Amino acid sequence: MKKLFNQVLVAAGVLALLAGCASEEENVIMAPLPIVKSEFTPKTLWSASVGDGVGHYFSKLAPDYAYDKVFVASRDGVVKALDPQNGKVIWTTDLEIEGSARLSGGITAAFGKLFIGSENGVVNALDAETGEPLWASAIEGEVLAAPAADNNIVIVNTSRGALIALNQEDGAQKWTISTEVPNLTLRGDSRPTAVAGGVFWGTPSGRLAAAIAERGQLIWQQPVGQPKGATEIDRLVDVDASPLVIGGTLFTVGFNGQLIAIDLRSGQPIWKRNYSSATDMATDGSRLYLVTDKDHLVAVDTRSGTELWSNTQLEHRLLTAPKMIDDYLVVGDAEGYLHWIDRNSGEFIAQQLVNDSGFAVGPLALNDGYVIVTRNGQIKKLTIQQ
């Protein structure tokens, strides 16, 4: 019954990505679970929990590892630091004051602090050692993606098209860059990428933008997709994926747009390929791995943009962003399965049912295993046993 219920809800889950226009629905069918002969069985090293998780809400609230701690959070405001060796709680902080904290963008660990944004338009800073709340800064719009941290500032991308830099010491706003927001957008935003003195991010209007991080000066904007089609949904062109940087090349992908490689300094495209996605990518340097809007897994050569393989067997299973664990590519799905895929061929290596509440985000890699967080707030550290 649970499996059938999830399949019925797939169309609703896809439409929940939209910020409006509920009348233009499209029925989709979740692909049946592939039959996989697993080459290994992941072993659970420890288990824990954090609040009620993120529930059925859209969320990119993901765990982070820093300062020899695993940091996790729930939508309602519970934040924990866990010992990565045994899962024991080092500290717990509850950011709920009046009603749910609605945490949604994070976790980012930097400067000895944790930074977490919320749907309430608040960026919270906590002491990473003690969990003590240090400051909370009210900003313009929801924070649906993790902040970036660089050069003593914290940079957040908001649902209202504002890229905002905050002083990491006290949360004071240093600068704001505003970009156009169409009437209808996907639910979600691009996590900024800060590198080489610049900050790069995707916009709801289908562009990749670049600015000087120190003073918030816009340098260039490159179209990733152009609105086209008869309906508002057809014309969605959000760039919600976090830009990836490899050497002097920047990579991003847009919904109803393109996968594009861009010269970091000039902002000029090197190559473009027709892929549609609103999910973060992964890379091993020579290949890009992405999940398309149909939940197809694709590997692309970073130098030429040539497709190396494609796996369509998880279509519409509401996959997480792909993560690299050891020699494998790993994604979670809406029914709570983890799928291990050969990075060279795209073939399934292993499969495991972890928790039927499903996954909103993929696993966090550690040196001696990886941590997964399910939608209902269950946390497990797993390791691969051949």
Curated annotation (Swiss-Prot):
Q: Which SUPFAM superfamilies match?
A: Quinoprotein alcohol dehydrogenase-like
Q: Which GO terms describe its cellular component?
A: cell outer membrane
Record has Ubl conjugation as a keyword: no
- Identify the PROSITE patterns for this entry: PROKAR_LIPOPROTEIN (PS51257)
What does the UniProt keyword field contain? Cell outer membrane, Lipoprotein, Membrane, Palmitate, Signal
Q: Mind telling me which Gene3D superfamilies this protein's record contains?
A: YVTN repeat-like/Quinoprotein amine dehydrogenase (2.130.10.10)
Lipidation positions, renumbered (N-palmitoyl cysteine) = C21
How does this protein lie in the membrane?
A: Lipid-anchor
Q: What does this protein do?
A: Part of the outer membrane protein assembly complex, which is involved in assembly and insertion of beta-barrel proteins into the outer membrane.
Known PANTHER family for this protein?
A: CELL SURFACE PROTEIN (PTHR34512), OUTER MEMBRANE PROTEIN ASSEMBLY FACTOR BAMB (PTHR34512:SF30)
What is the name listed in the Swiss-Prot or TrEMBL entry for this protein?
Outer membrane protein assembly factor BamB
